[in-house]
Structures are given as C-alpha cells and as structure tokens.
Amino acid sequence: MVTFVSEMRIPVVIPYKPIQPKTRLSCILTDEEREDFAFMMLRDVVNAVKNAGCSPLILATAPVELDDVPVRILEEGLNETINGFCEGNDEPLAIVMADLALADRSAILTLLTSGGDLAIAPGRGGGTNAIYVRSAKMFQAQYYGMSYEKHVRYGTDAGLMVKIIDSFRLYCDIDEQDDLIEVFIHNTGYSREWLISHGFEIAMKKSRIGVKRPGYE
C-alpha cells in the first residue's frame, strides 16, 4: 500500500509515458518533438491539478523531473500499480491522464465535486480520461480496451454511486494532428506556446479549421 502525505489535499495520479509518446503525431512531429510536446501537456495537467488545490503524483514509465512534483516509476502494469495505491487506502484519490492539455482548475474541480462515490470522465473511443473515487479502497482500475464501460460496470456492481462527468476539457485528449486545433483554441498554457514556437498555425482545411506546420503539409 502507498501512503500519500498531502496535507489534506486530494492526491491526483498522472500516468505519463516520457519515451516514444504520441506515435499518432509522427506525421507532423519528430520523435524528440513528440517527447517535448508530451512533457508540455504534462506540465499543463500538473498546473491544473495544483490550481485545484490537489497534490499531483506523476506515474511514469521512465525517469522524469518536473519541479517539485513527486515521481513514481511504473514497475508493474498501470492497473496493478494503481490498485496497489488503492489497497487499504480510505482516502480520496483521483487519476487524470497526462494528455488532457485542455484541463484546467474548473474541470478538475468538476471531477472532484460530483457528489458520487466514483466519478468518471470518459474519453473518445471508450477510454477513461479521469477518475475520482471518494475512498480509494473502493476502486479497482480497469484501464485499456473499453475502460469507460468497465469502470462504470465495476462501480455499479460494487454498489457505488457512479457519476459521469460531462466535461469537454476532460473528454478531449490530444492524440492526433486534428486534435491540435483544440489546443490552439482552448489552451492558454505550455502546450499552445510550444506549438506556436515550433511553427504551428491555424489554417483552413476544406470547411473546417485545423493547424498546419510549414514543411509538413
């Protein structure tokens, strides 16, 4: 069991892959750039968590440093590691993915204040982008595959009050080139500044707006 020392702040676990992240952005970013951009998104998520009065904990697949944020290296599978955090832990716990570049203080607080035993913010394609559980020992992680459906079913079967969080900022994970326009429109932090500094700009694509980068059209 892992004990969080958080001075009454809710701990928020942020799973993060620092090496070879975001492969679907390979069409427009180099390997090094993908790692840099993923780190910028992590910084934005950490800031959102801190601004909501919570204590971030980065759960990384390789060593990483970000200011004073504690980092734990993922030595088992994600589900096994999170379940280890939860075992015997009566305290609240949240899990927020590192690619939610649009997340802000308000979105995190919406997750934490739903009033349910288990609050789930779905992601595209049946994934789970963020979770809050009132008592960590009541939860078992079901990530990968149709994790949203599995988490809802687990909470329902366990007799928990399950709340579904309808939040665009928590729903919109950044995985592909077409997602980058959302960063331009809705992000005001590190991720947007990084894109601008690397030559990205808003462009019309047929009947929709998107982003372009000179030399990558």
From Swiss-Prot:
One of its GO terms (molecular function) is phospholactate guanylyltransferase activity. It catalyses: (2S)-2-phospholactate + GTP + H(+) = (2S)-lactyl-2-diphospho-5'-guanosine + diphosphate. InterPro entries: CofC, Nucleotide-diphossugar_trans. Keywords: GTP-binding, Nucleotide-binding, Nucleotidyltransferase, Transferase. Homodimer. It is an enzyme of class 2 (transferase). Transmembrane segments: none annotated. This is 2-phospho-L-lactate guanylyltransferase. Guanylyltransferase that catalyzes the activation of (2S)-2-phospholactate (2-PL) as (2S)-lactyl-2-diphospho-5'-guanosine, via the condensation of 2-PL with GTP. It is involved in the biosynthesis of coenzyme F420, a hydride carrier cofactor. GO terms for biological process: F420-0 metabolic process. Its EC number is 2.7.7.68. Belongs to the CofC family. Pathway: Cofactor biosynthesis; coenzyme F420 biosynthesis. The keyword Cell cycle does not apply. HAMAP family: CofC (MF_02114). NCBIfam families: F420_cofC. Pfam families: CofC (PF01983). Signal peptide: none annotated. The keyword Nucleotide-binding applies.
